[in-house]
Amino acid sequence: MREAGEEKVAWKYFTRDVVPFAAMFAVECATVGSNTLFKAATLRGLSFYVFVFYSYIVSTLLLLPLSVIFGRSRRLPAAKSPLFFKIFLLGLVGFMSQIAGCKGIAYSSPTLASAISNLTPAFTFTLAVIFRMEQVRLRSSATQAKIIGAILSISGALVVVLYKGPQVLASASFTTVLPTVTLHQQLTSIESSWIIGGLLLASQYFLISVWYILQTRVMEVYPEEITVVFFYNLFATLISVPVCLFAESNLTSWVLKPDISLAAIIYSGVFVSLFSALTHTWGLHLKGPVYISLFRPLSIAIAVAMGAIFLGDALHLGSVIGSMILCIGFYTVIWGKAREDTIKTVAGSEQSPLLLTHIIEDGAFPLS
């Protein structure tokens, strides 16, 4: 009986902690890959309005059969239901964040986007407190850690945006990757509007935090991940049609060729608008908005490597210092969150000595 109980607890730990951790890490890899491909495609002339529109089209078409096959276990609400209005808001917020993010990367680089993404835990925690999804006890060490971490994250982001500094790693020209780009300056973010890009990216990650909060509320009412994500992408597509067609009036820009632009659009539609949205929606339902946002700092190292390999981006001192401050803030927030979750779990396990023993033995895992 004891062994069976331990196996049950271990399986529960695996499904509720290990699997979400691995899934969120995969999402960060997919997101950085999409940012890098998008930046490379813009250097070849891809309009970010075209990119956003076609990406939503791809994900919506792929989700349609999935929602029919797997998403009908719960009856759909009426068309006039407040739920559909909330999902429409999800589509609007998601579309706005995509536009801000694409424009921000076009002005700067995927590395800056990954650095600024560390604001997401601070934004999400603040919004979660405002909407009473997180408890604030000022005398609690967990709450103090989350507040200090949020302040450090914002400070680090300001350093990244406002202080570029000298090069730590020199940029390199990779003409084999982008053969039509001949000027070295086109391959780096040196000539880009760093501050404007940073502000746009900060706006993107604030909107993403709003999306997390709103999506969590939607999942509380209608916990059908595939159906919700399908309608989210459908509404985002409908919103993007007039906006993108009006903003990008050059018809030749809408003609796609089998090159890196098409690859970037398909990749984004499959791995960001579909896979990442589904995974985040599932994670929000399982773990909550603050947990999902805590994985953003993992993208920094991935973005630096991809930017250096595929874009020839230089690494600047300001990005290094700011990212270090951001990471300290991130791990401070995650420590506070882990401590808070541990206290809640132990408090709820007073009647289950076996579960309590398992928690104590596995105390080395900060995300449990």
Swiss-Prot record:
The chain crosses the membrane at residues 18-38, 50-70, 82-102, 111-131, 142-162, 194-214, 226-246, 260-280, 292-312, 315-335. It is found in: Membrane. It is a multi-pass membrane protein. InterPro entries: EamA_dom (IPR000620), WAT1-related (IPR030184). GO terms for molecular function: transmembrane transporter activity. Residues 33-161, 208-334 form the EamA domain. GO terms for cellular component: membrane. Keywords: Membrane, Repeat, Transmembrane, Transmembrane helix. The keyword Membrane applies. PANTHER family: WAT1-RELATED PROTEIN. Belongs to the drug/metabolite transporter (DMT) superfamily. Plant drug/metabolite exporter (P-DME) (TC 2.A.7.4) family. This is WAT1-related protein At5g40240.
